[in-house]
Curated annotation (Swiss-Prot):
Parts of the chain that traverse the membrane: 7-27
Periplasmic side: 1-6
InterPro entries assigned: Cell_div_ZipA, ZipA_FtsZ-bd_C, ZipA_FtsZ-bd_C_sf
Keywords: Cell cycle, Cell division, Cell inner membrane, Cell membrane, Membrane, Transmembrane, Transmembrane helix
Annotated SUPFAM superfamilies: Cell-division protein ZipA, C-terminal domain
Membrane topology label: Single-pass type I membrane protein
Protein name as annotated: Cell division protein ZipA
Tree of life domain: Bacteria
Span list, region Disordered: 116-146
Annotated GO CC locations: cell division site; plasma membrane
Record's subunit section: Interacts with FtsZ via their C-terminal domains.
Lineage: Bacteria, Pseudomonadati, Pseudomonadota, Gammaproteobacteria, Alteromonadales
Cytoplasmic topological intervals: 28-346
Family membership: Belongs to the ZipA family.
Amino acid sequence: MEDLQLVLFVLGAIAIVAVLVHGFWSIRRQQPKSLKDSPMGNFYKKQAERGEGAPKRVDADGFDADGIGAVRVRKANEAHTPEAPAFNPYLKQEAKAQPQPVEPVQVEPKPLFKQEPSMAQPDFSLQSPTAKEQHRGPKASRQEPVLPGHSANLAQAHVGQSHAAMVAQKAAEEQRAQVQMPTQTALFDEEEAYEEEQPQVVEQPDDDLGEPRDVLVLHVVAKEGQQLNGAELLPCFLTLNFKYGDMNIFHRHVDNAGNGKVLFSIANMVKPGFFDPDNMEQFSTQGVVFFMTLPCYGDALMNFSIMLNSARQLADDIDAVVLDGQRQPWGEFTKQDYLHRIRANA
């Protein structure tokens, strides 16, 4: 048994040593070789040692086998002399024959009237023949010199053309003004005729209704043991399009904004019968009165219908009761009686 253990121990040690040796060998093989150990490094080293003592071979132009020549030193202050251009006798002869152009006289006549921007004016600006030829491009042929007399003739021609253009423009404007004047006169005549044709509106005075012959009354009273508060009445009046006015009471007008004739009114049921809008929060009453006089402005049936609906709406908003002129509950019989009174006073 001891021999078997010894054998296994020896085999294990051998295996461990083999693994370590194989690992070091693998690591060393993967490392890159240095330039000294590479075969090309020895080759370059030998070439360098061999070339130090041997003379370089150069060709007839002074370049060696690699195409490298000897070093040349140039002076820094050596100036570059441009080459003289080739002599051209034709250009010299043409330069002598070319005279210097004479600048023409620019004549700017003062305009007789203000020009309109919409009309395009012709361009009569003078240019010397030399400038025109330069604008068109160079020519191989010789150019004729410009004489002072020729420039003066051109200036006179320019003045004549400008004067003719201004005269033509003035004539066109006069003709246009003559065309516009009858048109404007016709427009003024049409406006005057239209004003004459308009009928003059004469405000007619409103028909006087005379003395009232009957009064339709509706009461809106609080329930037994209760009061109507002014803080609740005021917003209800404004919602129903009533406006505070004459006799310190609220009125309903033809226009909902409070303009026009009065259709019917609301008064306090308790004496003195008026309201104080500034102290409505401290105000309380047993009820209010809707009343409409007959005859009235507009349709009496329509006005009464509006008054009845307003009274019912107010009673619903403040939890009150609608009564007739005798302070009796409103019913169908009372309604028919009111309609009969309206027809009788129509």
